[in-house]
């Protein structure tokens, strides 16, 4: 999640009302439990996998420099064909830089980057997404190889709608190219 002046802008939607399904074998059919509805990439068209064996490695955190990075490759199943995917965050007083450096064993499908928000989303120009939430304005700049799409997610569950309102939004940045190595900033 990314907060600006104590206001969440890019969010984790949280868990809806607990039901039998939440604790059963079908829990990962619930959208809030799926990595596609978190601020994570789909690699080679494959989402991050659930289960304790799927986790990031080589995490680095330096609070003084305000940086964090992790290799998230092992959080994805074998069919993602990902050798290495280093996601890095660098925070300064005016911006958060997210960088993805990756190496795939094979490029099978275009990658996509997902971001969830509850704010008003607009696309003022190519390469730019604007999000406004409770008086806070944030701009997400993205590389030209991506096309931005917006999905509206209706919140019928009061446990979610009481926090975020009637709907939230998934911003998806989709690249058209299939490359075995690269980086996104």
Model-inferred region functions:
Residues 1-21:
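Internal mixed beta-strand/loop scaffold within catalytic domains of large alpha/beta enzymes
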Residues 15, 20-185:
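CBM-like, beta-strand-rich accessory domains located in the C-terminal region of large
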